[in-house]
């Protein structure tokens, strides 16, 4: 897993991006070789795969949460499979209430509030657990580039601000794969944090399967206080923008690497920064679950997905999956 902040050259090419291109070519070749040699397995239920083409937050977790609520409302049984980023997980496990983010990943802890969740780093290990749970649908979070299992329905999430960055593969750029193939194969494309009617040029060929989505706060936060914001997620800028758009007075920011595991020393430093700014700490749900075992008084901004075409989503999901 790449534990980096999103470097500027991933968005706008410079000499560093070009110097890293030879490594990107190796990455591309290894990906091609992996896909060529893979023998995909059929999982024992219909599979909805939610993924993206690039490193960094694109709203996948919120899409998975939305799908979970949608399926639950239809009384469709489902299991969520998550990748256990940032955890010390050794083998696939069904998440229970006592699990921590360090054991199963921050996303797993969050998603477990919406239904049964299996955390794994190897997709093939989930089969016995799926057979025990017997779901109608498997929602797979962030295995889009994994060639070892069959996908019945794919959703590609795209951040409206970053799109596909500088267009280069890792590490010269943010791309896990070039987008055209993924977009062509996708059943739906979510353009996340899009507040405008204008569709980016690269997505215009896919307008018939494009859904505009916004990530919005799902609860009220006291707007009379000052806040010092911090996060260790893939797209912290979007989180900070959400805070400002919500009308909070943000006096300072601190960014940590994606899926960062906080130490007591980090917490003490954050409290010190908040005190300097006469502010209360505020963070994301993904970060907040890391502090379960630490004495803290941190405000958590919970968010949810709002989409412009729920009927299109319902039609495609229940028609094909």
From Swiss-Prot:
Q: What is its EC number?
A: 2.7.1.130
Tell me what reaction this enzyme catalyses. Answer: a lipid A disaccharide + ATP = a lipid IVA + ADP + H(+)
* Origin organism lineage: Bacteria, Pseudomonadati, Pseudomonadota, Alphaproteobacteria, Rickettsiales
| Alphabetized InterPro entries for the sequence | LpxK (IPR003758), P-loop_NTPase (IPR027417)
Q: Where does ATP bind?
A: 54-61
| Family that this chain belongs to | Belongs to the LpxK family.
User: Could you name the Gene Ontology cellular component terms for this entry?
Assistant: plasma membrane
Q: What is this protein called?
A: Tetraacyldisaccharide 4'-kinase
Query: Function, please?
Result: Transfers the gamma-phosphate of ATP to the 4'-position of a tetraacyldisaccharide 1-phosphate intermediate (termed DS-1-P) to form tetraacyldisaccharide 1,4'-bis-phosphate (lipid IVA).
* Molecular-function GO term, any one: tetraacyldisaccharide 4'-kinase activity
Pfam families the UniProt entry points to: LpxK
EC main class here is: transferase
Q: Quick check: keyword Lipid metabolism in the entry?
A: yes
The record's NCBIfam families line, in alphabetical order, gives: lpxK
Matching SUPFAM superfamilies: P-loop containing nucleoside triphosphate hydrolases
Going by the UniProt record, its keywords in alphabetical order are: ATP-binding, Kinase, Lipid A biosynthesis, Lipid biosynthesis, Lipid metabolism, Nucleotide-binding, Transferase
Q: Name one GO biological process term.
A: lipid A biosynthetic process
Pathway of action: Glycolipid biosynthesis; lipid IV(A) biosynthesis; lipid IV(A) from (3R)-3-hydroxytetradecanoyl-[acyl-carrier-protein] and UDP-N-acetyl-alpha-D-glucosamine: step 6/6
